[in-house]
Amino acid sequence: MMYHIPGVLSPQDVARFREHLEQAEWVDGRVTTGAQGAQVKNNQQVDTRSALYAALQNEVLNAVNQHALFFAAALPRTLSTPLFNRYQNNETYGFHVDGAVRSHPQNGWMRTDLSATLFLSDPESYDGGELVVNDTFGQHRVKLPAGDLVLYPSSSLHCVTPVTRGVRVASFMWIQSMIRDDKKRAMLFELDNNIQSLKSRYGESEEILSLLNLYHNLLREWSEI
């Protein structure tokens, strides 16, 4: 399943990020990809050795960790270190699949269950640059407002179309979920959403408490901690 997570960053935060990123050192984006991806990748990324990068990636982690909808959809166990990329002048990233495992500075290795893109450019400011994701439900084309994030299974083939006008800037990361299986994770997300909707409409009740008990028992049964 694919999820749109709105408002991860406020407009003020986005403007500040963009101001900092205009001063950043950018390097060839192929430095962080494998052999297959390097053949179709043509973009730039912020140099991860810079102090500016360290500060910005911490802010992204804090923002997603504090976003209730992100947590409910991803049920994250481990988040990768966020990276930042830039596309301009017809730069693109052809169809590829993300690696199943990635190195992690604290945990050694992590499994990539979900991929996330946090948009930092207003969609009207550039042409092209759509994230195209192929999954079992078909093809999805994504171009979200700045500050919004999209979550999708890392097992999906995906690409970024050429940016023919303007500049597309984004942050991206991977998530190892407590729930490995996409279908089980989607069911928990739907159940959680319905519980929250019922609570807001009717308040607390024995029936809602029973559903909440079911949610946590399923999470206990399926989670990998």
Swiss-Prot record:
All residue ranges annotated as the Fe2OG dioxygenase domain in the record: 78-177
Cross-referenced SMART domains: P4Hc
HAMAP family, per the entry: Hydroxyl_YbiX
Cofactor: Fe(2+); L-ascorbate
One Pfam family in the UniProt entry: 2OG-FeII_Oxy_3
Protein name: PKHD-type hydroxylase YbiX
Binding positions for Fe cation per the UniProt entry: H96, D98, H158
Any one GO molecular function term: L-ascorbic acid binding
Alphabetically ordered keywords of this record: Dioxygenase, Iron, Metal-binding, Oxidoreductase, Vitamin C
Cofactor note: Binds 1 Fe(2+) ion per subunit.
Keyword Translocase: no
UniProt-listed Enzyme Commission number(s): 1.14.11.-
Entry binding sites for 2-oxoglutarate: R168
InterPro entries, alphabetized: Oxoglu/Fe-dep_dioxygenase_dom, PKHD_C, PKHD_hydroxylase, Pro_4_hyd_alph, Pro_4_hyd_alph_FE2OG_OXY
One GO term of the biological process aspect: intracellular iron ion homeostasis
